[in-house]
Amino acid sequence: MNYTKAKYIMGAAKVSQLPEDTGVEVAFAGRSNAGKSSALNTLTDQKGLARVSKTPGRTQLINLFDLGDNKRLVDLPGYGYAKVSEAIKKQWQSEMENYLTTRKCLGGIVLLVDSRHELKEFDSLMIEMAISFDLNLHILLTKADKLNNKERAQANKMIESFLKTFIRTDKISYQLFSSLSKMGLDKLKEKLDIWYQ
């Protein structure tokens, strides 16, 4: 797949505003400061494709990018310490759940988790949701260039230990990743290529 062809299509506030539910979509999700926009820009080799905001949590829309052949990348709203009201946060969360549970063309979810921190409530929720709805999930442990080898091993172990608490995790995979050094970029592309087949 040629990810450099990605073109912005639209931003939707609600799932009902999305284009027809056909083809294949891969959704990127993550807390506001997990490096989601940077990862999308690195994947597509386009610096400004997904806006890297200085105010985390500004992605309030479901943003879609066309890859051709009825294949799309989806940037889900950043979730976390956004300076918005609880009511708006709840609205985002319900739209996100709606997207993940009703979108038939969803080929998989890439969940971005900051490798330097423990799993947050949102991360755990996303993993649990993927398992309960039998969705493909690939966890990117981002900002791994900032870790030494011991810390990288600890980040992998953290995910491994969490996944051990579930019976079925055959559709879940994880890897270290860095937008800055492009560490793990080829592995990410390989995973997406399978989902887009």
Curated annotation (Swiss-Prot):
Which residues of the sequence carry a binding annotation for GTP? 30-37, 57-61, 75-78, 142-145, 177-179
Q: Which GO terms describe its molecular function?
A: GTP binding; metal ion binding
**Keyword annotations from UniProtKB, A to Z:** Cell cycle, Cell division, GTP-binding, Magnesium, Metal-binding, Nucleotide-binding, Septation
Q: Which HAMAP family match?
A: GTPase_EngB
Q: Which residues form a coiled coil?
A: none
CDD domains (UniProt xref): YihA_EngB
Q: Describe the task this protein carries out.
A: Necessary for normal cell division and for the maintenance of normal septation.
GO CC terms in record: cytosol
> Do the record's keywords include GTP-binding?
yes
Please, one GO biological process term?
A: division septum assembly
What family is reported?
Answer: Belongs to the TRAFAC class TrmE-Era-EngA-EngB-Septin-like GTPase superfamily. EngB GTPase family.
- Would you say which domain of life the source belongs to? Bacteria
Q: Which cofactor does the UniProt annotation name?
A: Mg(2+)
Q: Does the keyword Cell cycle apply?
A: yes
Q: Locate the residues binding Mg(2+).
A: 37, 59
Q: What is this protein called?
A: Probable GTP-binding protein EngB
Organism of derivation: Francisella philomiragia subsp. philomiragia (strain ATCC 25017 / CCUG 19701 / FSC 153 / O#319-036)
Q: Where does the EngB-type G domain lie? A: 22-197
